[in-house]
Amino acid sequence: MKITSYCLLFSTALLSSIALAEQLTAPLAVQQPYTVRSPNGDRQDPYYWLRDDSRTSPTVLDYLHRENDYANHYASAYQPLTDKLTSEIIGRIKQDDSSVPYTKGDYSYYRRYETGKEYPIYLRKAVNGGTEQVMLDVNELAKGKSYYAVSNWQVSPDQNLIAYLEDDSGRRQYTLKVRDLRSGKDLSDQLSGLSSSLAWAKDSKTLYLVKNDPVTLLSTQVLQHKLGQDPANAKLVYEETDNSFYMAVGNTADDNYVVIYLSSTVSTEMRVQDAGKPASNFQLLAPRQRDFQYSAGHISGRWVISTDW
């Protein structure tokens, strides 16, 4: 019976979409002569004009809007089927679900989803008892936005602040925000154009962030930002010039070091800084070499390295 229902919905949608498509002419991208120069030889690309890294060209945007309008017009007949399938998929998901708590410092941390809400709620509770505290309700943060995601968050060593990275465009270009967990209010500190990793120094005032190139979107710089200072004056502590390497920052499991992680297909590299000395320089743990990959953890005052050598 269910299969028959879907077949009827699909047949109706197909006939309707054909009728709709006949009423609307598909946009046609014009061809403009253009030669792409390359060390491996030149080639012709008549659609090169559609490339706009700034995403601001009125001509390109107008064409893309017409493409989207045509696609939406064509697909609108399938909306009943889309709604039916979406409802069935949602019906198979446990909506009131929580993660297993983990303990760090004086608190247990966990994530919860609530029925009818699309986004997670991040919470904590003191290990010695007390009331549950909402750190971030992503449902509230997402209100009024067509897209919203929190990629990463980290609580400060003094347990009073939470730094989080949000994206409201879908381009994975994140903005740093910092919330005071005592008041529930966000601080004025904001940095944009970031990747999805962050780390704290032990002073609970210094943050490490990865800046993306605004054109290529590749991670290129590690910035050190001190809370309360102008984000424009964030200190550059490392810059990667090899675009084959991905970059991230984090803390060791014992929180004694801040780490810059660098990785490519065939090699890795780690640079470390004493988390209690944010004014010190990052030190190279082991230099990158082709066909050499490693990871390291800091345990009881020494580094333990695992490698594929």
Where are these regions (language model features)?
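Bacterial N-terminal signal peptides that target proteins for export
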Residues: 1-8
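Beta-propeller folds
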Residues: 8-13, 19-309
